[in-house]
């Protein structure tokens, strides 16, 4: 029986219940996040009040900062926040001990320390970057509580540092307890699904390319370049998974290697696709058919299915089949450099997938998973210039506010130093987003001022118990947390984050509340001044634009490749790959697909040059190879390709037993020549005159 009517007719009771259930399922996760945020803040305040700490609101603030929509992100952030807190508290004690009576030296070195933390926050990634920033502004927070009207350290700094660090760590622990008790986590599962989806799509398209006749050979450039972008996006998801599981964290090098295995697979796919596109129709069809038939039938069926579930179901069994295929391709009899290239590059694709399957076995807790890779990949710093600029900006901005505070003897001006330190250190790694982020943060802080004033002066005077305080906090944190979770606009998310972070600081709940409106608005003035200084610093001393950073990454890689071509001492292939991987990961989102492809091509050319030079030493053909690589170093692509052909002729005349090695070298020559021909303009740009 229908008891309600919709626009299209009667709605049954079951349909109405279904719609309500669907609506509740949509709002339940953000509502739960709001409840967790509120509960974490209340628990932190309760513990801090029970311990009778001086400023319990720092515990609540820390709990609000640590809370994230994902459990793994919260736990990972909490762990790194704890490290940064201890480091920052230790440093302020050291500074005070070194300069107990020298106000100028103390303030100057505080600015230097914040500059160093800004440098580290730019160099590190994800939550490690946050930890470095925290080490800087924790020192500023403790210094603010320890300084007088115009500066100068106090002998009580050690106890104060211990107290502040304790308050912050209480907030971290309480947030972790609340979130771990109300969320089973899902980052590990999501990461496994992302890895499996990428692996299945990459291998599915690769096998389909091999199965098509030459006349139907698709242009896979756009697809490969989009895959590069998606692989780069895995980096923060890996960090979240590390926060959820100590077992996964112990095996973290395996996950990094799995990510770089995807890059290696895309590099091998690029080599195969580029070479097939340059062959005649008959030769291309024959080569692709040989490679495809060399794959085990069991592996082909999995790859052609293009199903991520098959990769997750039994990654170790698939690993064994892929490993067998790699050995088959490497040992494949080849009588031409073309076939040797196709076999070796296809083996590179599958070898990359072996690393991915190792990572999947870890993520799905497969029995008999491989032992942890203790080596992993060590990422180098892709570019030191942004870190140096951020360090200089932090030092100058914080130093300028310190001088203004000392000169004016502004009683609450120390709060401006803290806000400037927080914004500069947190936003500097964001690059071109830092200026806009600081403006939005200021707007969010203004909203927190209004909300905190309403709660503090309109509600709290009538409340006497801690449960009543929690009820008052719920009025703010529940809707704010709900809005943060449902927001899909970065601007709104930043503004709401600023509101939740600053609310407790402005409310300042302590055992004996102070309702002095003059003091409140003096503190608000200092905070808003700090919020105004940060955007000014970013506008006067702007970060490198994304376009400039992209050009620098490409120029640095091109320079490194030219140096590699003529280097007296070759780096290990692992070191070269780590350097280029770090630049791929750090590449701004604004990079075009072509620019990502150029970095991937440089990765391939560099690795092949290293292998070819090592091979030439064994074959006694270094003179011919050096002549070709010298033109690579000079940016003369056409001449380099011509001399590589001459070197290929020299290798073709190699007698047994080195003929097999020489044939593999001829395949490497083809890879280098085709990559240089495809991206000749890039490899020639920036060459020495």
Give a label for each model feature:
Residues 188, 550, 554, 577-584, ...:
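Generic hydrophobic, helix-prone segments enriched in Leu/Val/Ile
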Residues 224-227, 255, 279, 605:
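Hydrophobic N-terminal alpha-helices or hydrophobic patches in metabolic proteins across all domains
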């Amino acid at each position: 029986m229908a008891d309600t009517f919709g626009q299209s007719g009667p709605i049954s009771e079951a349909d109405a219940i279904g719609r309500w259930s669907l609506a509740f399922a949509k709002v339940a996760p953000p509502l739960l996040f709001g409840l967790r945020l509120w509960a974490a803040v209340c628990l932190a305040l309760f513990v801090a009040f029970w311990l009778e700490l001086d400023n319990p609101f720092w515990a609540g603030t820390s709990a609000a900062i640590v809370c994230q929509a994902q459990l793994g992100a919260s736990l990972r952030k909490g762990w790194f926040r704890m490290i940064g807190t201890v480091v920052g508290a230790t440093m302020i004690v050291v500074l005070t001990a070194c300069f107990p009576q020298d106000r100028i030296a103390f303030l100057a070195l505080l600015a230097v320390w914040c500059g160093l933390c800004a440098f580290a926050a730019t160099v590190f990634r994800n939550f490690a970057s946050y930890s470095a920033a925290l080490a800087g502004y924790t020192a500023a927070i403790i210094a603010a509580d320890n300084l007088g009207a115009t500066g100068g350290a106090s002998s009580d700094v050690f106890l104060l540092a211990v107290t502040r660090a304790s308050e912050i760590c209480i907030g971290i622990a309480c947030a972790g307890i609340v979130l771990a008790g109300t969320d089973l986590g899902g980052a590990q599962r999501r990461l496994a699904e992302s890895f499996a989806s990428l692996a299945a799509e990459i291998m599915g398209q690769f096998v389909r390319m091999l199965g098509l006749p030459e006349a139907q050979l698709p242009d896979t450039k756009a697809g490969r370049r989009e895959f590069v972008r998606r692989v780069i996006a895995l980096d923060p998801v890996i960090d979240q998974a590390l926060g959820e599981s100590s077992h996964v964290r112990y095996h973290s090098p395996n996950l990094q290697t799995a990510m770089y295995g995807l890059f290696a697979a895309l590099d091998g796919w690029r080599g195969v696709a580029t070479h097939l596109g340059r062959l005649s129709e008959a030769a291309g069809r024959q080569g692709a058919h040989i490679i495809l038939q060399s794959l085990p039938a069991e592996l082909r069926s999995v790859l052609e299915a293009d199903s991520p579930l098959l990769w997750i179901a039994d990654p170790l069994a698939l690993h064994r089949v892929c490993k067998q295929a790699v050995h088959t391709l490497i040992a494949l009899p080849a009588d031409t450099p073309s076939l040797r290239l196709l076999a070796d590059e296809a083996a590179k694709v599958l070898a990359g997938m072996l690393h991915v399957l190792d990572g999947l076995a870890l993520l799905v807790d497969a029995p008999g998973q491989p032992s942890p890779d203790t080596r992993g990949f060590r990422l180098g710093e892709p570019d030191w210039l942004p870190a140096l600029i951020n360090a200089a900006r932090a030092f100058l901005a914080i130093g300028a506010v310190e001088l203004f505070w000392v000169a004016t003897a502004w009683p609450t001006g120390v709060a401006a130093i803290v806000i400037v330190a927080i914004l500069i250190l947190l936003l500097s790694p964001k690059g071109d987003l830092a200026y806009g982020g600081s403006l939005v943060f200021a707007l969010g802080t203004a909203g927190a001022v209004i909300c905190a004033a309403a709660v503090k002066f309109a509600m709290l005077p009538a409340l006497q118990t801690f449960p009543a305080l929690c009820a008052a906090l719920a009025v703010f944190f529940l809707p704010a947390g709900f809005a943060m979770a449902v927001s899909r606009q970065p601007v709104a998310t930043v503004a709401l984050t600023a509101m939740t972070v600053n609310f407790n600081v402005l409310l300042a709940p302590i055992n004996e509340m102070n309702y002095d409106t003059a003091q409140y608005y003096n503190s608000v003035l200092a905070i808003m001044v700090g919020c105004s200084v940060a955007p000014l610093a970013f506008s006067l001393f702007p970060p490198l634009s994304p376009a400039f950073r992209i050009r620098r990454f490409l120029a640095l890689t091109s320079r490194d490749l030219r140096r590699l071509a003529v280097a007296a001492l070759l780096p290990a292939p692992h070191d070269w790959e780590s350097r280029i991987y770090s630049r791929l990961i750090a590449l701004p989102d604004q990079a075009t697909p072509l620019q990502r492809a150029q970095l991937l091509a440089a990765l391939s050319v560099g690795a092949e040059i290293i292998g070819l030079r090592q091979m030439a030493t064994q074959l006694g053909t270094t003179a011919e190879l050096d002549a070709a690589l010298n033109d690579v170093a000079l940016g003369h692509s056409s001449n380099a390709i011509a001399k590589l052909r001459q070197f290929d002729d020299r290798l073709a005349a190699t007698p047994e037993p080195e003929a097999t090695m020489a044939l593999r070298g001829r395949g490497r020559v083809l890879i280098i020549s085709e990559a240089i021909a495809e991206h000749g303009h890039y490899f020639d740009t920036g060459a020495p005159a």
